């Protein structure tokens, strides 16, 4: 209730009249922000498979020149790479993922990795089942298409409205191609590895990297000792930086890609070696670094039809050797 004083006549103050006014709180009229209880950190993760040990299998750190520094615990967090682009020709200077390699842990890394892959395969089976059920409908909404596979939002061809014809969603139907390791740069304790993938074919969700110390030929009486591998999972970029490596040591690295259809094949083991540390000849402030680049061999497939083969037979008949 509010009291209003009115003036009447020649300015003399009359008896106050009370008038009932409905005072509306302006603040209540303002639109209230709708909190999102299911806030999801959409930074795609690059995570190494970890074990309950005092020493972590892989620890990541961001570049010093990044705009935002993410301080997250190693055990329970996933780390994102600045280099999330999947360019056919990666560069080692575009903020690669950093991985600190420590003493290898026990051998059930493979079991954890297979569990991740089984989940990935199970998800693809469910997606294929949903696709079969939705194929009965002549029209399918965009929301249904977005939940069944990986969509390239930058491609305007996929953003078409459905008409009387049956629409086809961008569902990954095959596993990715085998990556090709094209470049590496090594120092005394670090290594930057880059690879490419077949662009324009199957989409890639993430990569998996397996690193293993190369076995050296021992004496004849002593058998070779198998080293335990390091397995790094959910890598988004095409460049990784390995740190805390042993100097003057050979390593083998292999990469494979994965998407909703499953995982592809491992590439051929790529062998590299760190340089030796010689502080007498080279100062510590100017370490030695070696960069090696290679190109993927191009293969051409020649096909012949039956008519062309018959022409060759006719030529052999007309012009014998």
Curated annotation (Swiss-Prot):
One Pfam match: fn3
InterPro entries: FN3_dom (IPR003961), FN3_sf (IPR036116), Ig-like_fold (IPR013783)
All residue ranges annotated as the Fibronectin type-III domain in the record: 175-277
Name of the protein in its database record: Fibronectin type III domain-containing protein 8
């Amino acid at each position: 209730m509010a009291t209003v004083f009115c003036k009447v006549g020649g300015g003399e103050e009359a008896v106050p009249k009370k008038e009932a006014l409905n005072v509306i709180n302006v603040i209540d009229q303002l639109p209230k922000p709708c909190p999102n209880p299911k806030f999801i950190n959409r930074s795609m993760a690059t995570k190494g498979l970890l074990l309950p040990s005092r020493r972590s299998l892989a620890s990541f750190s961001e570049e010093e020149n990044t705009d935002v520094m993410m301080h997250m615990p190693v055990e329970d967090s996933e780390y994102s790479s600045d280099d999330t682009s999947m360019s056919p020709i990666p560069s080692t200077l575009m903020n690669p993922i950093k991985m600190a390699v420590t003493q290898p842990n026990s051998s059930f890394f493979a079991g954890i990795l297979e569990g991740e892959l089984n989940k990935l395969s199970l998800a693809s089976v469910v997606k294929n089942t949903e696709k079969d059920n939705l194929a009965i409908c002549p029209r399918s909404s965009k929301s249904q298409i977005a939940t069944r596979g990986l969509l390239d939002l930058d491609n305007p061809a996929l953003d078409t409205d459905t008409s009387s014809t049956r629409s086809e969603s961008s569902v990954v139907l095959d596993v990715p191609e085998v990556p090709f390791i094209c470049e590496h740069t090594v120092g005394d304790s670090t290594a930057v590895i880059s690879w490419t993938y077949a662009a324009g074919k199957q989409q890639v969700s993430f990569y998996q990297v397996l690193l293993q110390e190369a076995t050296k030929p021992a004496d004849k009486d002593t058998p070779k000792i198998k080293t335990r591998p390091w397995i790094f999972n959910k890598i988004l970029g095409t460049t990784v930086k390995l740190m805390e490596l042993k100097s003057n040591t050979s390593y083998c690295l292999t990469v494979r890609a994965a998407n909703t259809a499953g995982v592809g094949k491992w590439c051929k083991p790529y062998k590299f070696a760190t340089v030796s540390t010689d502080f007498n000849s080279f100062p510590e402030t100017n370490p030695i670094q070696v960069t090696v680049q290679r190109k993927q061999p191009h293969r051409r497939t020649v096909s012949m039809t039956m008519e062309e083969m018959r022409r060759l037979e006719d030529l052999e008949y007309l012009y014998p050797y």
